[in-house]
From Swiss-Prot:
It comes from the Eukaryota. It comes from Dictyostelium discoideum (Social amoeba). Belongs to the UPF0538 family. Coiled coil: none annotated. InterPro entries: UPF0538 (IPR018794). This is UPF0538 protein. It holds the Pfam family DUF2340.
Length: 124
């Protein structure tokens, strides 16, 4: 049987407008993990991983698939705003949400996302 532990790339988004994004690489993640538990794990990693100091002040609450390997990358470099069906459901496992090996997942504040989606303009 195939090993269910995978590497995932988490794109922690502090600011949509300024494209303040930092990748967090997580290894040996069980894809059968519930999304709400996974969010807690990622939030803990942000608090304890060196280099994430500017990202520690936000209360990240949402996850959305940015890119699935061998799939099409979105046009927007900050977040996938075209496909709202890519949001991860808290009540399902990562695998049930379509997460596979080396999937890139955006982790962000929903309120900031909704503002950005109304006017997806970059300030810089």
């Amino acid at each position: 049987m195939e090993n269910e532990n995978k590497i995932l790339i988490i794109r922690v988004i502090r600011s949509f407008e300024y494209r303040t994004i930092k990748n967090l690489i997580l290894k040996d993640i069980d894809l059968n993990t519930n999304v709400s538990d996974f969010k807690k794990l990622v939030a803990d990693k942000i608090q304890t991983t060196p280099g994430f100091t500017p990202f520690k002040t936000k209360q990240y609450d949402s996850m959305k698939i940015f890119f699935v390997p061998h799939g099409q990358k979105p046009n927007n470099l900050t977040i996938n705003i075209e496909n709202d069906h890519f949001f991860l459901n808290n009540n399902k496992s990562l695998a049930e949400n379509g997460v596979v090996y080396e999937t890139e997942i955006s982790f962000f504040v929903m309120e900031d996302y909704l503002k950005y989606k109304e006017n997806p303009e970059n300030k810089w």
